[in-house]
């Protein structure tokens, strides 16, 4: 009867941390811009615009005091907009921008502490050495190669966003029971929600969701996704259990949801009583796999199309009743794997079917056996990559290379280094593609864009510049994969490099997707 209660409180009981006093500790802000925090488990370094990247305890204390003043943040924007050409008011407008960064950065740093400690302790308990190796994005693809070839249907899920910031705070409240800290966070989100509304009417940028402030909001969003995945795992386990229980046992289990008390998710229990009991046993599927990436998710199953539709509407009800998030049916697409290609982490993935006939000879009789083998295939989406290059001003939308005027002030070595780094990163990331020849076009665009940029800097034509500099200037853009592999594998290693342009090599040191392959 207490299975759900124990499952939901299993991890939350550890989160009895008091975070509010940490806002007034000097060492927190010394760690904030330390190299150790820059290499944090969760995030990349955040660059604060117009600031020397040194947080101050005194400034934070003053900001916390002032933020409780009525309409303090909005008044700064109003004062600055009355006369933009007055230096004092311009400083006030910049101060509102800077204050939002300071407060959000402080929240993000402190709220990460208990969860990073919990993650480290988890791997220590499981005795998993070097858990940072598990962060590789490419580790997902070998998993898909092993699992998807045996499945039939896949659902592309676009995870909905919460319509109100209070939902995020309430979810966090179930895990961190620190009233002052949550109250300040709620007040901060409320004030900047009003500030955003004011800035939208004035056709200005939204500071809260800007690049400088994305750290704390990315944490809250990821935590919201983690919460519904946490409950989804429970639903999945119950659906797997139901296929092994008798009908009498199932009728007894339908009442244990109503008997649970003293939980922080009473609303979830009410939802279960309303629709969960009627739909759960329809969704039993022993072969189901779930992968989430960049605000999207993939749910693959060996079941029928009807079963996938039942899971689809269960998600809709779950989001609506528990998270108060309204989701449209177009957010989930159900497709058959054998006839569908889906874009996944910079690759165009599909399930290829290979038909073959085997002649079997038995005594005087012979007969043919038709066999079908499935293979998970990943190719480079050249059209999407060209679109990303066009957006970054390396080429036109049709793929015609152009110069990069903003880089002409750099030295020749810096220009070559930047273009070469982009080219190597793309080749490194797409090393698992089954058709790497398509990368040659991307390399050609970058090579010619680099030549045009250097020629523009020296006020010359591309042909004249290359004739004067030598043909070997841009050879690094066409570094063969064999040369890269020869640096990784020792000569004594029996590794066949011949034909490696057809080999699929997944590098397990890539922890985040490259900006140029992020098309979402």
UniProtKB/Swiss-Prot annotation:
Pfam families: Intron_maturas2 (PF01348), MatK_N (PF01824). Signal peptide: none annotated. One of its GO terms (biological process) is RNA splicing. GO terms for molecular function: RNA binding. Coiled coil: none annotated. Belongs to the intron maturase 2 family. MatK subfamily. This is Maturase K. It comes from Ruscus aculeatus.
């Amino acid at each position: 009867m207490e299975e759900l209660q124990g499952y939901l409180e299993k991890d939350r009981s550890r989160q009895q941390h008091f975070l509010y006093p940490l806002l007034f500790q000097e060492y927190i802000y010394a760690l904030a811009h330390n190299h150790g925090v820059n290499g944090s488990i969760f995030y990349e370094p955040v660059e604060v615009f117009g600031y020397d990247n040194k947080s101050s305890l005194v400034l934070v204390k003053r900001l916390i005091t002032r933020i409780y003043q009525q309409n303090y943040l909005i008044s700064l924007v109003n004062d600055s907009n009355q006369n933009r050409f007055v230096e004092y008011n311009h400083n006030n407008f910049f101060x509102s921008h800077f204050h939002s960064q300071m407060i959000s950065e402080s929240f993000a740093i402190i709220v990460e502490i208990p969860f990073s400690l919990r993650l480290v302790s988890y791997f220590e308990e499981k005795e998993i050495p070097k858990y940072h190796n598990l962060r590789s994005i490419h580790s997902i693809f070998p998993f898909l190669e092993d699992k998807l070839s045996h499945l039939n249907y896949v659902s592309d899920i676009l995870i909905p966003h919460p319509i109100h910031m209070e939902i995020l705070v309430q979810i966090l409240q179930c895990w961190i029971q620190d009233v002052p800290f949550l109250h300040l966070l709620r007040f901060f989100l409320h004030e900047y929600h009003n500030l955003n509304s004011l800035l939208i009417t004035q056709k200005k940028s939204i500071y809260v969701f800007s690049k400088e402030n994305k750290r704390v909001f990315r944490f809250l969003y990821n935590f919201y996704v983690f919460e519904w995945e946490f409950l989804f795992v429970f639903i999945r386990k119950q659906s797997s259990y139901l296929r092994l229980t008798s009908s009498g046992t199932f009728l007894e289990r339908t009442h244990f949801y109503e008997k649970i008390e003293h939980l922080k998710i009473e609303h979830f229990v009410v939802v279960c009583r309303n629709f969960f009991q009627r739909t759960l046993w329809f969704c039993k599927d022993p072969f189901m796999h779930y992968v989430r990436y960049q605000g999207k998710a993939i749910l693959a199953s060996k079941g029928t199309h009807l079963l996938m539709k039942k899971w689809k509407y269960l998600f809709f009800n779950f989001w609506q009743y528990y998270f108060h998030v309204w989701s449209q049916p177009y957010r989930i697409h159900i497709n058959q794997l054998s006839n569908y290609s889906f874009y996944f982490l910079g690759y165009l993935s599909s399930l290829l079917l290979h038909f073959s006939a085997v002649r079997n000879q038995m005594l005087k009789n012979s007969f043919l056996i038709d066999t079908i083998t499935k293979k998970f295939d990943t190719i480079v989406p050249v059209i999407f990559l060209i679109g990303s290059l066009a957006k970054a001003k390396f080429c036109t939308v049709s793929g015609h290379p152009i110069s990069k005027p903003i880089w002409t002030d750099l030295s020749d070595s810096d220009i070559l280094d930047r273009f070469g780094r982009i080219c190597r990163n793309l080749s490194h990331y797409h090393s698992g593609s089954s058709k790497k020849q398509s990368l040659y076009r991307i390399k050609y665009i970058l090579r010619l864009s680099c030549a045009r940029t250097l020629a523009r800097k020296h006020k010359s034509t591309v042909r004249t510049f290359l004739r004067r500099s030598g043909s070997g200037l841009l050879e690094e853009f066409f570094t063969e994969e064999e040369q890269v592999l020869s640096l990784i594998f020792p000569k004594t290693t029996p590794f066949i490099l011949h034909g490696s342009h057809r080999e699929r090599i997944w590098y397990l040191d890539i922890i985040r997707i490259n900006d140029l392959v992020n098309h979402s």
